[in-house]
Amino acid sequence: MNTRPDKYRYPAFLGLDETTGRYYILFPDLPGCTTTGDTEDEALASAREALSLHLFGMEDDGDEIPAPSPLTGLRGENGEAVTLIEVWMPSFREKMETKAVNRTVTLPGWLDKEAKIAALNYSQILQDGIMERLKISRQVAKLKKRRIGSPA
């Protein structure tokens, strides 16, 4: 059963760093989740990406995700504006879970040379080999890719 929420909404502080001239965003409920931008709009767009990535990491690690603080009573320390950042997770999860990952492989030099001459695609060969070993058909792989991020 999928218990991960589709949507998160967290309060954030938006401020201007006088020394750099860049805008910053801090999430008081999520220590370490911060971002910046050259403009307010850039900082806010970056905040959505940072929040999505931070929460995805917490979900993936099995960490408890804190409830967002109520807006009432929140005040920025240095005159920061308080704003709400909302993220839609299903599409972000799918992007992260279907993202290609790099793997380092080691093979003899002569074999690498022959593979280059034959213009072989290492990634495709490795995927095909792993799917064959795990007895996963291309059709099943496509279905798995489509289902990622959907409720179970």
Which residues fall in each region the model found?
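Short, charged, surface-exposed hinge/linker loops at domain edges
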Residues: 1-10, 48-106, 110-118, 124, ...
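A contiguous binding-surface segment within folded domains or other stable secondary-structure elements
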Residues: 6, 18-20, 36
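Short aromatic-glycine-(Arg/Gly/Cys) micro-motifs in beta-strand/loop hairpins
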Residues: 14-29
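Short glycine-enriched loop/turn motifs at secondary-structure junctions
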Residues: 27-30, 97-99
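Short, flexible N-terminal segments of the mature chain
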Residues: 30-31, 129
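A short, exposed loop/beta-hairpin motif centered on an aromatic-Gly-Thr core
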Residues: 31-41
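Acidic helix/loop or adjacent segment enriched in Glu/Asp that either coordinates divalent metal
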Residues: 42-47
